[in-house]
A protein has these predicted regions:
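Detector for C-terminal structural segments
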Residues: 10, 17, 30-34, 67, ...
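N-terminal lobe/hinge region of extracytoplasmic solute-binding protein
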Residues: 29-119, 126, 149, 218
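Ligand-site clamp/hinge motif
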Residues: 128, 211, 244-295, 336, ...
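Extracellular/periplasmic solute-recognition and catalytic clefts
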Residues: 168-170, 226-237, 262-326, 333-337, ...
Length: 604
């Protein structure tokens, strides 16, 4: 009976699609080619290719990418080890794939249809009959259920959090699998399940899954791992039998026959390798280098070009993170005092050629940001149970990060800092800031791993010393930095949280109370706030874009009020340099540049 019902549903979905009614609005019955978090997908069931990809892109050649850091595992799905880049996507696929011109819409990949109810308390995926792993074995519902169970029990903390919300998963037909989400009250969860990596049940030993390994995972994606030099490089080659090459979502993508990622432990070595042509495309993050260092012969000769790509995503939160698990940073007044000692104007002018903009929100650069916007009635309603969670100037939209005179010796910020320190029980004795009751000096360590981080930290430390703070910079290699970060073993460090136009479950992983004690989560600050948890819940249960924006802005206000980071800065555009042998489409996605849509010029 279940199989017959499923077939009837699929027939209904096909009829709706054919009539033009199959595109999802708030909700429509039946199976669909896509699912949007809010509203309906931009591309109908008959779409031919993504708007940002060129379906005529030539196939062939090799792309070499340079990565700063190292790796000691090819398994990106567990907390152990430093995984190599791009295993997910290149080798391992999910049920659905993102459309990168929309905030959060997923289109068919391993699954060719998705069906959910109005409450999104269940979701059913029907697998594409052509879907195969690289060894030729069919992808079936048992692989999907196996992946869910394995990642729920042994995966990274975010997987465990998300997939634990699923009550049950079961095969309902030869190609269909249904997830029961009853009680989750999480409208994003069907999409999160749609992005779940699907692993080959017959090729994985669950007892060894959490071990670091250089043995490639078997996947269903467009590439397979062809060579590994531990810590130095990973090579991928095209799977000539890739089952999904004709899918609409893939048209114009995956154009290289081979892709290699070379790893560099040092930023200068990384840049010099690009100048020599040892890798093809570089994302620049240093405005000083972008402004002055691209003067080498290949650029003058036109063999290298610099390009600036606009992107419509929130700019994320790049900040110096207070580990509030440390007693020294438990008092919010202390954190705010230190925020007042960061001289962005001096640093931006002297280090960054005034190219950066100051971060003033966890969702800067889009309508989700609360910066400069008074809270509306819906936000105030959400925040009413937490009257002390948001400070008045953040509630009315007048707050902005402290602005200095740019001299490097700003007295206004120093006075504000001393007033806050005094309120928190600290006083200046001679040239040292000490706790008045215990006499304990105010001292902490700032952990860094790159030269850029170290340079910023040293500049900040100079200003902290003016306030009598004994701040020390400790530089460690990438492996030690990652391990200490995972274990929350730091006082302060720099970190960047990326954001999307449809933030959701990952916010619990970033700021949720449960994540504060879960090693491997990204709640590096140790936020434990009922207000934060409630705003995340409101985001996840929002049924309209208006309610979603209100909940996200309310979350932004609570996080800003907590002074959990010293907000840093962001570039207004993506700075990309490439050797001209690599070409790209004329249209840029909402997410900016996408290397999977680029191609090698010699392949024409």
């Amino acid at each position: 009976m279940q199989w017959q019902a499923s077939r009837r549903t699929l027939m209904l979905g096909a009829l709706l699609a054919a009539s033009g009614l199959g595109r999802i609005s708030a909700w429509a019955a039946g199976a669909h080619h896509a699912i949007a978090m809010h509203g309906e997908p931009d591309w109908g069931a008959g779409f031919s290719h993504p708007s940002y990809a060129d379906p005529a892109a030539p196939k062939g050649g090799q792309l070499v990418q340079g990565v700063l850091g190292t790796f000691d595992s090819l398994n990106p799905f567990t907390v152990k080890g430093l995984p190599a880049a791009n295993i997910r996507g290149y080798v391992i696929e999910s049920l659905l794939a993102r459309g990168y011109d929309e905030p959060f819409t997923l289109y068919g990949l391993l699954a060719d249809s998705v069906e959910t109810d109005a409450a999104r308390s269940t979701v059913t995926f029907t697998l594409n009959p052509a879907a195969r792993f690289a060894d030729g074995k069919k992808v079936d519902p048992d692989d999907v259920i196996f992946s869910w169970q394995l990642l729920r029990d042994k995966g990274r903390p975010n997987f465990r959090i998300y997939y634990a919300k699923v009550v049950k998963a079961e095969a309902t037909a030869e190609r269909s699998v249904r997830f029961d989400l009853a009680g989750a009250d999480d409208r994003e969860l069907p999409l999160i399940i749609g992005l779940m990596p699907v692993l080959a049940r017959h090729a994985i030993d669950p007892d060894k899954f959490e071990d670091t390994t250089f043995e490639p995972l078997l996947g269903s994606g467009p590439y397979v791992v062809s060579a590994v030099k531990p810590g130095k490089s990973v090579s991928f080659k095209r799977d000539p039998n890739y089952w999904g090459r004709e899918l609409p979502i893939n048209h114009g993508s995956w154009n290289f026959d081979a892709i290699r990622f070379d790893y560099y432990r040092d930023g200068n070595t990384h840049f010099e390798a690009f100048k020599k042509g040892l890798y093809d495309v570089r994302t620049e993050t240093d405005p000083g280098r972008w402004q002055t260092a691209y003067d080498f012969p290949a650029l003058a000769q036109g063999r290298v070009v610099k390009e600036e790509f606009p992107y419509g995503l929130p700019k994320g939160m790049d900040g110096l993170v207070f580990n509030t698990r440390r007693p020294i940073f438990a008092d919010m007044r202390v954190r705010e005092a230190i925020l007042n000692l960061f001289d962005f104007e001096w640093i931006n002018h002297n280090y960054f050629f005034d190219l950066y903009k100051r971060t003033a929100s966890y969702f800067d650069g889009c309508d989700l940001s609360a910066h400069g916007v008074p809270a509306n009635a819906r936000e105030r309603e959400l925040l009413a149970p937490f009257p002390d969670a948001v400070r008045a100037d953040i509630m009315d939209g007048s707050w902005t990060p402290p602005v200095s005179d740019g001299s490097g010796r700003d007295r206004t910020g120093l006075r504000r800092a001393f007033a806050l320190f005094a309120a928190a029980g600290y006083e200046l004795k001679g040239t040292r800031l000490v706790h008045a009751a215990s006499g304990r000096p105010f001292a902490f360590e700032l952990l860094t791993t790159t030269r850029d981080q170290e340079r910023l930290a040293l500049a900040f430390v100079r200003n902290l010393k003016r306030a009598g703070i004994d701040a020390r910079v400790r530089s460690v290699d990438a492996t030690q930095f990652e391990r200490r970060r995972i274990m929350f073993d730091f006082d302060m460090m720099q970190y960047r949280w990326e954001q999307s136009l449809s933030p959701g479950n990952e916010q619990s992983f970033y700021w949720g109370s449960d994540a504060a004690t879960q090693e491997g989560s990204r709640n590096y600050m140790g936020v434990k706030s009922k207000a934060v948890d409630a705003m995340i819940a409101a985001m996840l249960s929002a049924t309209s874009r208006e309610d979603f924006v209100a909940a996200t802005r309310a979350l932004d206000r609570v996080l800003l009020s907590g002074c959990y980071v010293v907000p840093l800065y962001f570039p207004p555009k993506q700075w990309i340099a490439r050797w001209t042998r690599i070409e790209h489409p004329s249209q840029t996605s909402l997410f900016g540049y996408l290397p999977e849509t680029w191609w090698h010029g010699d392949a024409k």
